[in-house]
Amino acid sequence: MRGKTIVAIVLVAMLLTPVQAGDVSASQSEPEEDTRQPSKGNASLFVFHDGLNNEWSHFNSSDEDSTEENETREDKDNGVIDIKYRFMMKPTLEKRLNMTVGGEIRGNFNIYYEGDNEDGGNGNCNGDCDWLNITIFKGAAEIHQHTEQPWIAGNWKNIVFSYIVTEEDAVWDSTNDNPIVEVTMKVKGDRTSDFGVLVSGNAAAFGMQLGANGQVEFPIDDSTWSEDFQAGIEEAPPEDTPGFTLVIASAAIAMAVFINTKKPEDDE
């Protein structure tokens, strides 16, 4: 009977002893990381344009499909240039992101324009112009919009803004919350010429730098990269909740006690 008790105790000890899992990764090659996705130490979303009608964004500062000049530009002698760029992340966001509450989402862009873009001024806008607006979207939800008042035409301007993350904005649920940067502006030109001899007025133009010169930095918290967060487990279980191993161990102890107390009955 004493032998049975010893076996039960040994079983308990085995259950309570942590087992070191083997390194299965040694025999498997890890998939190559997509640098267009966010990662630890890489939290900046960059914008790109092919110079035609396609714009996109991702977390790599360069893209071979973007314009070689790293800049997009539109010109018009007479009339309105209506800018509406939607830099949606491509490829789509694969991981869940946990932003630091109280941290700042920071935008940094370089914009150029010529012509008039202010209604009600001394220019030629009559309700058909608009200031520069840069809007950050979390999927379909608008997170923040920055409006920049007009500056002296014919000059580049570094546009910098920030937004403090709230609890409601903290968790970005991968594909459902794919980030988008939207840039809108309306500038108007009134240049006219008389058979190419007499030229009057000013042409309209819009320019925007891309890649490293056009980005949004996110305060991605380190907890983002944990397996629990990626699995949707955002809070650890309460400390007083017994784990599975503890339950099994308790059962084994009870078995040992039962066997030991049964000894007198067996002797009879």
What are these regions (language model features)?
Residues 25-43, 48-49, 54-59, 64-96, ...:
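Proprotein-processing/basic-patch segments
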Residues 35-36, 124-129, 141, 259-268:
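Long, compositionally biased, intrinsically disordered regions
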Residues 101-102, 117-134:
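Short coil-to-beta strand junction motifs in C2/discoidin
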Residues 1-29, 236-268:
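Secretory targeting signatures
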Residues 107-114, 137-141:
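Short glycine-rich beta-strand segments
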Residues 130-131, 135-196:
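Aromatic- and Gly/Pro-enriched, solvent-exposed loop/edge beta-strand patches characteristic
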Residues 79-83, 99-105, 126-128, 155, ...:
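Solvent-exposed loop and beta-edge segments used for protein-protein assembly and interaction
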